[in-house]
Amino acid sequence: EYSQQNNRGKFATEILSIIKDSDRENSLGKLKEYRLNKHFDYKADEYILQTVTSSFTMKDLVCTQDVREEFEYFIKERQQTEALVQMDIPVSNKILLHGPSGCGKTLSAYVLAGELSRPLIIVNLGTIISSRLGETSKNLTQIFKTAVQEKAIVLLDEFDSLGKIRDYDQDHGEMKRVVNTILQLFDFVSQDTIIIAATNQLQMIDEALIRRFDLSIKMDLPNS
C-alpha cells in the first residue's frame, strides 16, 4: 500500500543527503552558482535543486576502471562533437547512471560538467509527488527548453520516481502523461544538450525510458 507520508519522509532524507554532499563539494570551492537566463515561471523552480558551474575533473572521481573508461570516452566524444556531426556520426548525449546511494552519481555529473565546461542544472524529479502533479509536464518542458538554450547539462535526479508513482492507481493518467513528456523531451533536445539521469532503483524505470539512453553506466560504492 502506498503511503504518501512514508514517501515524503524518505524523500526528505534523500534531499538532505544531497544537500550535505553538495555542501561538502562546495567547501572545496569547485562549484559556483550559475544564474540561468530563465524561460520558465517560478513554479518550475521547485524542480531545480542546483544550477552550477563546476571545476571538478576526472581526477576527483573514485570509480572502477571500466566506469572511468566509459566517462573518458564520452568526454572525448563530446569534445569532438562538431567534427563528428559534420561526418554524420551520431554523438551520445543521454546517460543513465544507476547504483546505490553514495556511489558517486551526482559527483559524476559535476565531473562531466567540469570537464566539458558546461553549466549543470540538477532537476529533482521526486517533486512530482507534490500537490501540483498536473503541472509537471509543463514545468519540465520549460526547464528542458532553457537547458537547450543554455547548452547545459541536465541531471534528472531520483529518475525512478517516474516508475514508482506510475504503478499506483492514483494519478495514473497524469503520470503516464509525464512519462510521455519525458520521452518527447528526450527526442526534442539537440545533441548540444546533455541529459544525465540518476537512479538507485533501475528496476522501477520504464523500459521505454531506458531505451532512450545512449549509455547506461552501473556505478558501485568505492569500497565494493
Task: Enumerate the predicted regions with their spans.
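Walker A/P-loop NTP-binding motif of AAA+ ATPase domains
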Residues: D66-E70, K76-S224
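Interdomain "pre-motor" coupling segment immediately N-terminal to P-loop NTPase/helicase cores
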Residues: Y2-T57
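Flexible nucleotide-interacting loop at or near the entrance of a catalytic core
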Residues: Y47, T51-F56, D60, K76-T81, ...
